[in-house]
A protein has these predicted regions:
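Processing junctions and N-termini across compartments
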Residues: 26, 94, 113-115
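N-terminal pre-ligand scaffold of iron-sulfur
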Residues: 35-110, 143-157
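Extracellular/periplasmic metallocenter environments
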Residues: 120, 125, 129, 154
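N-terminal secretory signal peptides and thylakoid transit peptides that target proteins
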Residues: 1-23, 27-37
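Extracellular secreted precursors and ectodomains with disulfide-bonded cysteine-rich loops/domains
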Residues: 30, 98, 103, 117-119
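Iron-sulfur (Fe-S) cluster-binding segments and ferredoxin-like electron-carrier domains
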Residues: 107-112, 125-131
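Short cysteine/histidine-rich metal-coordination sites, predominantly Zn2+-binding motifs
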Residues: 114-122, 133-142
Length: 157
């Protein structure tokens, strides 16, 4: 079977274009991956745990706790995942879902200078109340009610 010069040239260009696009396509598809590495170099939040009972999660905040000092933030693990906690003032704590509303990546970083939680999957940023400061996320993080008393943070889960 004989192939024309024109057909040969077209097929060669198509093959070359496919080879050129494949790495870019691979990078694009990988950027949409929803799994994150909790030990990524960007992860900077300390991880704490608490005790679950009757729809609440109780976290002891002793003087050595990562959340003892105002301005700090942490990740608190529990049976259904993790929560983000920010401590903006002496008795105030903000508790948010750690799941980014863009593509459900885990948020594990906090920029204390800007007061923002950062999702390194796609660059979304959220303030300490969960509002979107920078997309691509368009919805705020889910908020959990909490109260602080007797050195314990009690979160409704």
């Amino acid at each position: 079977m004989k192939i024309s010069r024109r057909k040969f040239f077209v097929k060669t260009l198509q093959g070359t274009a496919l080879l050129a696009v494949t790495p870019a396509l691979s990078t694009f598809l990988e950027s949409c991956n929803t799994v994150t590495n909790p030990n990524s170099p960007q992860a900077n939040l300390p991880r704490l745990s608490g005790t679950e009972a009757n729809g609440t999660l109780t976290v002891n905040i002793d003087p050595n706790s990562a959340l003892a000092k105002s301005g700090n933030a942490a990740i608190i693990g529990y049976s259904k995942g993790t929560l983000l906690v920010d401590h903006p003032s002496d008795t105030t704590y903000n508790v948010l879902s750690s799941i980014c509303t863009h593509q459900q990546c885990s948020i594990d970083s906090f920029d204390s200078s800007s007061g923002e939680f950062i999702c390194y999957c796609h660059g979304s940023r959220f303030d300490v109340n969960g509002a979107v400061r920078q997309g691509p996320a368009i919805s705020p993080l889910a908020k959990y009610s909490s109260q602080f008393a007797n050195n314990q943070l009690i979160i409704r889960i």
